[in-house]
């Protein structure tokens, strides 16, 4: 149209005004006809393409696609965006609404020789989408460096460099062309890949910047200032994060609080570059270190914590198989100990919501010869609102027992600590009938005994009380970890290993559960996982930030519990192969259970994530005199 107007004007250079008017009328008439010939669908999208040019435009678009595809072959990976990014920064295009001329201009640019592509920064050369930190062996789960002694200088304090920043400074480029080819934040959208780190070497990717359409880039380049693109090497940041955590713990042990404070301030920045389990674990350990460095202790809210802990405990039960495994293996040992008994009594040192006992009641109801008379004593802490939560639990269990026709009796004991219990509290009420069969007692403790280690002599008193009632069996479930070391650095390193694996199992289990139970089918695993992370985070804070009587999460290994119970007059009871097989079957039914492992260890059963045991179930009886 533009050339037609110029030719019309040129032909009337020496003519009369009437001739000029005639030419003007012809131009207007041609324009009107051209607008009528424009494709209506493309016109609605803002593009002017005549129907007669549709075939030509389609051919040019196909050629453009082929040219861009050839460019992608020569510039693999993240360089694809850089291959065509100069179209928005180096070239002045025709009006984009004129689709035919716009495509033709880009096609001519692609056919021209391209400037050299600058090498990608090291952080963007490899990619990894795993949120799991692996060791050099690639074991498949979160593995940290081996624990170091307090005297080791492996994790000596050293400065941690800031993330690499790619700027658009022309002086830093080899040429103006290289400067223009570096994408900036003006008009582009950025997205970060899944964070990943490998302590033994491997792949990682930093921030990736995706190019916007050429028209948007051209407009943004003209109107918006250049924004630096931050490229973070997540592999290096992950290694520095772990070293910063351990160096901070070493500084705390040496009471070098100035160095510890400097490291505490760097940990959140390093943790932000990570993803998945590593970021969450680092956040909780960073918070715990900050509480210890700044000597910040929350207000005394023991009663409120008891109610909130029960809520978190319920979510932890739903999100992963650890508590299910604990209840199942303990119930199996109790069921075998009650074989042939007509009157049985279970003392639960931490009844919580009573989730362990419906399964045992049902198993007893199906026992050949009929169910026994079942009495349950539930021990729990006082409630903040002074409600009788223990009786509410007993009422629900009584209703369930009635439906399956089991003779059921219940009694709740409120105790601030298990050390307050006396033997007479666990004995049957009233005098026993001489004609009745004696009552067989079982004592059950799930994640309770380690809390007694905070008070000198408390564990010995409780074990003495248990020994006095002469139980047929005592079932104990505890964390398989040593978080009761006198050295703060050793305790910190061990807990970092333990909870990293625990969080990794939550991530792995939740992903498998999401596949089998999508939200539309009522999966609802998101809330359970978040609350379970809070449940574990409170334990981390207690292990790291607290000391003395406040530090109640004093977990010990199976070997240490074996020594303590042996000194108290108990001997181990072998958990049979039947419990092992049924526990393995239970895990096979649990979503995401591929990473969980059940192992038998000296007559006890452990449940772990891959090769790391995390909890252990053991059974005991009063040793023969």
Swiss-Prot record:
A motif (LxCxE motif) lies at residues 246-250. A motif (VHIID) lies at residues 344-348. Gene3D superfamilies: Transcriptional regulator DELLA, N-terminal domain. Keywords: Transcription, Transcription regulation. Residues 241-278 are annotated as: Required for possible homodimerization. Residues 392-431 are annotated as: Leucine repeat II (LRII). Residues 239-294 are annotated as: Leucine repeat I (LRI). Residues 1-34, 167-208 are annotated as: Disordered. Residues 232-621 form the GRAS domain. Residues 441-542 are annotated as: PFYRE. A motif (DELLA motif) lies at residues 39-43. Residues 545-621 are annotated as: SAW. A motif (LXXLL motif) lies at residues 449-453. One of its GO terms (cellular component) is nucleus. Residues 313-378 are annotated as: VHIID. Residues 189-198 have a biased composition (Low complexity). Pfam families: DELLA, GRAS. Probable transcriptional regulator that acts as a repressor of the gibberellin (GA) signaling pathway. Probably acts by participating in large multiprotein complexes that repress transcription of GA-inducible genes. Upon GA application, it is degraded by the proteasome, allowing the GA signaling pathway. In contrast, its overexpression prevents the GA signaling pathway and induces a dwarf phenotype. The DELLA motif is required for its GA-induced degradation. Belongs to the GRAS family. DELLA subfamily. This is DELLA protein SLR1. It comes from Oryza sativa subsp. indica (Rice). The gene is SLR1.
């Amino acid at each position: 149209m533009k050339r037609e107007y110029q030719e019309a004007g040129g032909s009337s250079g020496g003519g009369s005004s009437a001739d000029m008017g005639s030419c003007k009328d012809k131009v207007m008439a041609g324009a009107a006809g051209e607008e009528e010939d424009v494709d209506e669908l493309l016109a609605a999208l803002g593009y002017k393409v005549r129907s007669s040019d549709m075939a030509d435009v389609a051919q040019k678009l196909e050629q453009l696609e082929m040219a861009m595809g050839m460019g992608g072959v020569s510039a693999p990976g993240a360089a694809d965006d850089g291959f065509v990014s100069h179209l928005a920064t180096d070239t002045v295009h025709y009006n984009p609404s004129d689709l035919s001329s716009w495509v033709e201009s880009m096609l001519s640019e692609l056919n021209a020789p391209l400037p050299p592509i600058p090498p990608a920064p090291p952080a963007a050369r490899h990619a990894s989408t795993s949120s799991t930190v692996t060791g050099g062996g690639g074991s498949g789960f979160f593995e940290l460096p081996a624990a170091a002694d307090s005297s080791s200088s492996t994790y000596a304090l050293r400065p941690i460099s800031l993330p690499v920043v790619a700027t658009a400074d022309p002086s830093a480029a080899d040429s103006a062309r290289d400067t223009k080819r570096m994408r900036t934040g003006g008009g582009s959208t950025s997205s970060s890949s899944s964070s990943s780190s490998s302590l033994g070497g491997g792949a990682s990717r930093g921030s990736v910047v995706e190019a916007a359409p050429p028209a948007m880039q051209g407009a943004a380049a003209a109107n918006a200032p250049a924004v630096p693109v931050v490229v973070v090497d997540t592999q290096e940041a992950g290694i520095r994060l772990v070293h910063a955590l351990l160096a901070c713990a070493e500084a705390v042990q040496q009471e070098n609080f100035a160095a510890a404070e400097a490291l505490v301030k760097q940990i959140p920045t390093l943790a932000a570059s990570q993803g998945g389990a590593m970021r969450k674990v680092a956040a909780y350990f960073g918070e715990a270190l900050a509480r210890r460095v700044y000597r910040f202790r929350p207000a005394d809210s023991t009663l409120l914590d008891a109610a909130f802990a029960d809520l978190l405990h319920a979510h932890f039960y739903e999100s992963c198989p650890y508590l299910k495994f604990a209840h199942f293996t303990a119930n199996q040992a109790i069921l075998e100990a009650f074989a042939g008994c007509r009157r049985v009594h279970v003392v639960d040192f931490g009844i919580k919501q009573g989730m362990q006992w419906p399964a045992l009641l049902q198993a007893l109801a199906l026992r050949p010869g009929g169910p026994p008379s079942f009495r349950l004593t539930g021990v729990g802490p006082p409630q903040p609102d002074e409600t009788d939560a223990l009786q509410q639990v007993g009422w629900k269990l009584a209703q369930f027992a009635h439906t399956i026709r089991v003779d059921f009796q219940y009694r709740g004991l409120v105790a601030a600590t298990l050390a307050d219990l006396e033997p007479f509290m666990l004995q049957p009420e009233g005098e026993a009938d001489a004609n009745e069969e004696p009552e067989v007692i079982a004592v059950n403790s799930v994640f309770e005994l380690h809390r007694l280690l905070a008070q000198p002599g408390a564990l010995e008193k409780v074990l003495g009380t248990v020994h006095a009632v002469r139980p047929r069996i005592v079932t104990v479930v505890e964390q398989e970890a040593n978080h009761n070391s006198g050295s703060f650095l050793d305790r910190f390193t061990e807990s970092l290993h333990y909870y990293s694996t625990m969080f990794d199992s939550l991530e792995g289990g939740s992903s498998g559960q999401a596949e089998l139970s999508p939200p539309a089918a009522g999966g609802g695993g998101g809330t359970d996982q978040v609350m379970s992370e809070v449940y574990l985070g409170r334990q981390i804070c207690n292990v790291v930030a607290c000391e003395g009587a406040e530090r109640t999460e004093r977990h010990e290994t199976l070997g240490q519990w074996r020594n303590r119970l042996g000194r108290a007059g108990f001997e181990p009871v072998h958990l049979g192969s039947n419990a092992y097989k049924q526990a393995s079957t239970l895990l096979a039914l649990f979503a995401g259970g591929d990473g969980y492992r059940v192992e038998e260890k000296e007559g006890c059963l452990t449940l772990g994530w891959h090769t790391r045991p995390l909890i252990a179930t053991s059974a005991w009886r009063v040793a023969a005199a």
